[in-house]
Amino acid sequence: MQKTIMRRVAQGQGHEPVDLVIKNVRLFDLVTGDLIPTDIAICGDRIVGTYGEYEGVQAIDGAGRIAVPGFIDTHLHVESSLVTPFEFDRCVLPHGVTTAICDPHEMANVLGRAAFDYFLAAAERTIMDLRVNLSSCVPATSMETSGAVLNVDDLVAYRHHPKVIGLAEFMNIPGVLNGDPGCVDKLAAFADGHIDGHAPLMCGKALNGYLAAGISTDHEATAADEALEKVRKGMTVLIREGSVCKDLEALVPLLNVATSPFFAFCTDDRNPLEIAHEGHLDFLIRRAIELGVEPLAAYRAASLSAATAFGLRDRGQIAPGKRADIVLLDDLERCQVSDVISAGRLVNDALFNSREIVSPVGLESVKLPRPVTAQDMAVEGSGRDRPVMGVIPGQIITEFLRLDLPEDHGHVLPDPEQDVAKVCVVARHGHNDNIGRGFVRGFGLKEGALASSVGHDSHNICVVGTSDADMACAVNHLEKTGGGFVAVRNGQVLADLCLPVAGLMSDAPYEQVRDDLIILRKAAKTMGVVLEEPFLQLAFLPLPVIPHLKITDFGMIDVRTMSFV
């Protein structure tokens, strides 16, 4: 290390040629907001010189472009990109995301510690700096069947891994507020590190108590007044814009130069189709500026503020001593990325091809005790005053509705006239044969069934449909393929996307996943679906830590009271 330090010192002073120099660029200073012509000198993976001229062994002609620090996605689930960490790397890094802080709790809910082992091994080999927050709540609640349970000892075993930042989103709010021993043990074990929050709609003294546990960031704010209270109480609010949860427009009125140290950006869940059509963090920056945010505030939130919030002191600025994560832009306000430097390396196909790929784990994870039948989907009882989930497009929060539904010989039926479909959650981890049954409004589904083995957070199979036979067909198809998404009508598979890695991720290139998603969306529309992202919207129906009405393999849950209805 001593020799490395002395090389940096010598090259920074100009005593010897730097390893790489970026010439003829305008550096966007995140302290003052100035655009300053300069060379950027790099030694290995570190910046060693700015605001001067340098000679280098290698040189990049900036051609007058604008240099900004690499972007940091402060909270995401790689699994929600539907591809492996290596394809995520190849898909997202060209959009300027040089650091991604992931929570592998999707895979952890299926595989337990094996998910941490896989992600940490992959993180050592990706080009981007993939960091891991350890999944704090596996399972999220006791009101569902998960594939694994992680206790404090499981988490502590990874605490000092160099790729680990701290604890991921602490979703068990009642456990924190009521002093659940398992929750308190986890909070105490990571008290000297970062603890990420998950606090939808929390306010007042309940929020105070939650923050007093040592939690410092939150990505679940969906309204400006909610976010304002949280930043006033010391939280860093991570403004989220994913494939389902779209909170940016509601929150960016709070983001300005004065408040930017207390805001960062995240995507949480964003798939390759959205990335292809819109972008990743580059889209969030571009959209924020379109909505009136000053560029200085937007780029600070995307890098410097994010680095500060998560204790990554070696990045977030283009300055000597910082990690050489640099994005070259053709246009600052439109955030048009032209080149990316990650740890001093120009990002290109050759760099991606040099990686050593870690073999995927969790194959054949969809385990049903027997094929399901149409009879398994039946809902018995009265149709009067039935609890119904109301889907809100662009949100994972649902409405708690009560509607009268049609009946036939003691069975409650879906009602396309009211836009009400049946929804079932089928346990798929081989532990039991549970099936939760209920109803949902808002898909627009007129016929057939849609099913997904992605079902946050325990990832049982969630299926929505108007036909019990098609619903059963869809569930059985997912077991045969090892998991994924499928659209079925009249007993025929119209389209599917295979996700054999833990039933969550494809082992195919991200371009193929993107193309398969296009076909799936088109198939869903022929069945009447009106949602822009029906499969990810479907995948959040079983998440009982998000208000107001949800469904697991145990049944329908009133999230406010955490009781079955």
Swiss-Prot record:
What NCBIfam families does the database record attribute to this sequence?
ade
Q: Which reaction does it catalyse?
A: adenine + H2O + H(+) = hypoxanthine + NH4(+)
Q: Name one Pfam family in it.
A: Adenine_deam_C
Q: What is this protein called?
A: Adenine deaminase
HAMAP family reported for this sequence: Adenine_deamin (MF_01518)
Q: Which organism is it from?
A: Gluconobacter oxydans (strain 621H) (Gluconobacter suboxydans)
Gene name tied to this protein: ade
- Which cofactors go with this protein? Mn(2+)
List keywords of the entry alphabetically: Hydrolase, Manganese
GO BP term (any one) = adenine catabolic process
Q: Which InterPro entries does the protein's record reference?
A: Adenine_deam, Adenine_deam_C, Amidohydro-rel, Metal-dep_hydrolase_composite, Metal_Hydrolase
Q: What class of enzyme is it?
A: hydrolase
Which residues are in coiled coils?
A: none
Q: What is its EC number?
A: 3.5.4.2
Task: List the Gene Ontology MF annotations in alphabetical order.
Answer: adenine deaminase activity
Q: To which protein family does this belong? A: Belongs to the metallo-dependent hydrolases superfamily. Adenine deaminase family.
